[in-house]
Design a protein with these regions (language model features):
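Small-residue-rich segments within alpha-helical transmembrane domains of MFS-like 12-TM solute carriers
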Residues: 24, 28, 96, 112-120
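Residue-level signature of mid-helix packing/kink "hotspots" within the transmembrane helices
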Residues: 28, 57-66, 116
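Helix-breaking motifs and short loop linkers at transmembrane-helix boundaries and internal kinks
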Residues: 42, 76, 97-103, 114, ...
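Conserved MFS/SLC helix-loop-helix module at the cytosolic interface between two early adjacent transmembrane helices
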Residues: 62-102
Length: 136
């Protein structure tokens, strides 16, 4: 078995920044695409119902917070983050392939559930590694 090497502080910061960015990407990549998304999911031009895609994403994030904390305590940070990122990828792929509004909303909910693992594990890993002024 290969010996585990210590991660440099730069690698840890880059990793935490990446998983933090993935949470924002789920929202920021969607907002400018609303006009293009509407016809793809069967909504009329100018329909405000498309904004539910953001609302449902946040609902998924909120629901996931309740689940991932105990899962991380029981199974560990890395397996929980891997599970969450797999769910994130599933939701993002479903959102990309959605051809009706209901499927888009379901995919966005799944995407939000996955994103909540990234959000929660980002803070949890930070707290595990650093204390006090080192966290800033």
């Amino acid at each position: 078995m290969a010996a585990r090497r210590e991660r440099t502080e730069w690698e840890v910061v880059a990793f935490l920044a990446f998983i933090g960015m993935s949470v924002a990407f789920g929202i920021d990549a969607t907002l400018p695409a609303f006009d293009e998304m509407r016809p793809d999911v069967g909504l009329p031009p100018g329909s405000n119902r498309i904004t539910l895609a953001v609302t449902v994403y946040f609902l998924g994030m909120a629901a996931g917070q309740v689940v991932y904390g105990p899962v991380a305590d029981r199974f560990g940070r890395a397996p929980t983050l891997r599970l969450g990122m797999a769910i994130y990828a599933l939701g993002a792929t479903g959102s990309m392939l959605a051809t009706d509004f209901g499927f888009l909303l379901a995919s966005r909910l799944v995407w939000g559930l996955g994103a909540s693992a990234a959000s929660l594990m980002n803070l949890t890993i930070l707290r595990d590694l650093y204390t006090g002024d080192r966290m800033a």
